[in-house]
Every structure is written in C-alpha cells, then in structure tokens.
A protein has these predicted regions:
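Nucleotide-activated sugar donor-binding and catalytic core shared by glycosyltransferases
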Residues: 7-430
C-alpha cells in the first residue's frame, strides 16, 4: 500500500485531532443509543460491529459507494447499474448510515452488490474498514463529508468523488467558520460533480480546486422506474377501483398529524378519497397508526397485507416501496416540507407524471424545486388547510391535474443526462 506524503498545516492537524477525540468521546453514547433503540427494532442491532469498521474482506476491484440513507441510495441506483454494465468485473460495495438505506439497496440489487453499514468516523473504525474493503475508489452521494474517511482515503491514494453534490449557502458558511479543518479535507477530494453552478461555486469557495469541480446536473433527473415497480403500481391502482388517491411520502414527526388533519378536510368534499401515508422512518409507523385510529379514520396497513379498498388511510409501513406507491396515486405531497426538515426528492412522483405538492421548507432540494416551479410542475402550500384545499380542487379538475402532472414529467425528461456525465467522469478518472 502506497501512502501520500502530503502534509496538512499544523492548524489542520490540531483541529483534526480535536475532531477525532470528540468523535471517540461520544462514540460510547452513540452505541448505547443504538442498543437502546434496538429493543423496539432488533434489526438495528444486527451487524452493529460493521459501524466499527469490522466488515467482510473484499477482493478484486472494489468501488465503494456511500449513500447516507434511502433517498441517496435511490439516487445512486442508476449510476450503480451503469457501472456494473460497463465494468462487469468490478465489485460494488454499498454502504449507508441507516438500516433503511441498506434495506433499500438490498431491495434494488439483491446479490448483485455487497452491503455494509458505513463505519463511524473515528480513525480506528475507518482504518479497519479500509483494511478489509480495500476500495479502489470512494463514491460519495451528495455531501456526506466525513474528515477521517476522506483523510485516510487520501493517505492511501484512494480517489474520493462527490457525486450529485449540493451545498447550501448555510452549510458553506459553516465550513468557512472551520476553514482550518475544512480546506485540507476539501483539497483531498478528487472530483466534485455538482448539481448546479451555485453548488460548484460554494465548493470552490471552501477549498476544492476549481479544476476538480464540474457541473453535471442532478442524477435524480435520470429517474429510473423498473418495469416490476410499474406493474406493482398498476396492480394496486386496480384494487382501488377508480377512487381519488393522494399520497404523502417521506413524512416526519408531527407533520403526520397535519397530513391526517388535511385528509379529514379532503374527505368532507371527497368522501371516497384515500390517503396513502408513508412516514420516512420506521419508528413513526406505530404512532401514525395510533393517531389515524384516534381520529376515527379507517386504517389499512400494507405491512399486514390489509386491503386498502375500504380504508380511508393506507399506511405504507414497509421498506423500499415508496416509488411504487407514488405510481398508484393521483397526487403527491413530498414530506419534510411542512416542517423545517428541508424536504425530500420531488422527482420521484414527478417521474410518474402526477402533480407534486410541497410545503414551504424545501431548502435541501432548492435547485430541483426551482426548475419545477419555473415550469409550473409543483404547487407550494403554506399549511395543512392550504394543502387540503389544493388536493380537493385537483380531485375535482381532471384536466388541470393531468396538465400539472405532464409539466412535472416534462421537467424530469428535459433535465436528464447527468448520469452519463457522472459515469463517464468516474471512469476516466480511475
């Protein structure tokens, strides 16, 4: 193994040391929380040791693809498929920070790729992981910047690529406040494939060399809906027998309460309407089910195989099926936006050609939402009452509903192409 002899400045070494010590100090509490949460969800305890870098040894040419959770894993899928087609001899190792992210990856790829939890960002965990996985390159989806991960990859001359990279102005200012730590890490990145010019400018501003930054667009526009997903959506839609259906996907916390309240109002004008409610995190499944029943609504749970035909709320309490559930719906609300979570990916429902709703908080997907807004493929709502009014209105106006959905799909189609640029960029740099 060859090591890069480049040295960081003394200030960065001190800050790196302080950062690593802080991570070491809080690690026992992180593991305790993992064990505690595992009482209710035993899967959280499974393979916990992988988070300390103890993963199965890999052989051959290993491409390490890291995606923090479900959304980033879905975004990585077309890229992974393309890399496997163009380089059938490589081994793809997919990692995620969450069990939901790994579950999504397994659902999409089966035994085509290898899987592991991403190691916590301590020097020891990263070292053990790299010793065992021995990756040829590291591909990070979006902006998961972990100092020890990137620093040790540089030391081992493992190129680090940030793909579909985005950086908000708020995050850029945060990195500027710790320039002594951030700049050397940014200079260790081999290539940044930014979603938009403003993202590229911010990465250059915080230390990435201009020659290593390219604007490729967002690979999320290259949304890929497999035929088996389309078939499953058609089957579910057939079961719903022409009912007006709206879906709220990737919802958070008390946002679920607001959506249930909105559906109660929708039912006043459309008594046969169905809400498909899909919380972002599994630990919200039970509270959402209880809240639904408390409001006097008829509930069906997908995890239990219950028939949604007679239900008023269909709880999507399974993993990896959100894309299919979008396809069985007439309208879609994308969660994390009625509260200050920054929203989630609106291109998943837009790829089905259905109207998209969002609350006012979509700063995590600002560029994508702006393109949808420019072409009137998304409707913004201020609160639950506003959402209920818009949903009810579009249920009554088939022509307008179809027009908005087609505009959303057109935005997706005309912005495709980032995937080819990203895959070509990775291959030519390896």
């Amino acid at each position: 193994m060859r090591y890069d002899s480049a040295l960081f400045c003394p200030e960065s070494c001190v800050l790196q040391f302080i950062y690593s010590q802080l991570i070491r100090l809080i690690l026992p509490f992180i593991l305790l929380r993992l064990w505690w949460n595992g009482r209710r969800a035993p899967d959280l305890r499974r393979n916990w040791y992988q988070r300390l870098g103890i993963v199965p040894r890999a052989s051959g040419t290993v491409v390490w693809v890291h995606a923090v959770s479900v959304g980033e894993t879905i975004a990585a899928a077309p890229m992974v498929r393309r890399l496997l087609v163009r380089n059938p001899g490589i081994t793809i190792l997919m990692t995620a920070m969450t069990d939901t992210g790994l579950a999504q990856a397994r659902k999409m790829f089966g035994d085509q790729v290898q899987y592991a939890y991403a190691p916590y960002d301590t020097p020891g965990a990263i070292r053990r992981f790299l010793d065992r996985a021995n990756p040829r390159i590291l591909v990070i989806m979006e902006t998961e910047i972990w100092p020890n991960m990137i620093r040790q990859c540089r030391a081992r001359r493992v190129p680090v690529f940030l793909i579909n990279a985005r950086l908000s102005e708020r995050s850029a200012r945060g990195y500027e406040r710790i320039r002594g730590l951030a700049v050397p890490i940014m200079r260790s990145i081999s290539w940044v494939a930014a979603q938009a010019e403003k993202d590229a400018e911010r990465f250059r501003r915080i230390g990435v060399a201009p020659a290593k930054v390219a604007v490729t667009g967002s690979v999320k526009f290259d949304v890929d809906i497999p035929e088996d997903v389309r078939a499953a959506a058609r089957t579910l839609r057939h079961k719903l027998a022409g009912r007006p259906v709206w879906i709220a996907g990737s919802t958070h916390g008390n946002e679920n309460d607001q959506l249930i309240a909105a559906h109660v109002k929708v039912l006043e004008k459309h008594p046969d309407a169905l809400l498909i409610l899909v919380p972002r995190h599994p630990d919200r499944f039970e509270p959402v089910a209880e809240k639904t029943l408390k409001e006097g609504l008829v509930l069906a749970r997908r995890s239990m195989g219950e028939d949604p035909a007679g239900a008023q709320v269909y709880l999507g309490d399974t993993m990896g099926e959100l894309m299919m559930l979008y396809g069985a719906s007439d309208l879609a609300f994308v969660g994390g936006s009625l509260i200050e979570r920054g929203g989630h990916n609106p291109l998943e429902p837009a790829g089905w050609g259905i109207p998209v709703f969002s609350g006012p908080h979509f700063f995590n997907f600002e560029t994508i939402y702006q393109r949808l807004l420019d072409d009137r493929g998304v409707k913004l709502v201020s609160d639950a009452d506003d959402l209920a009014a818009h949903v009810s209105s579009l249920f009554s106006d088939h022509r307008e509903r179809e027009a908005i959905g087609l505009r959303a799909l057109e935005v997706v189609n005309k912005n495709r192409g980032a995937l080819d640029k990203v895959v070509d960029g990775i291959i030519e740099r390896v």
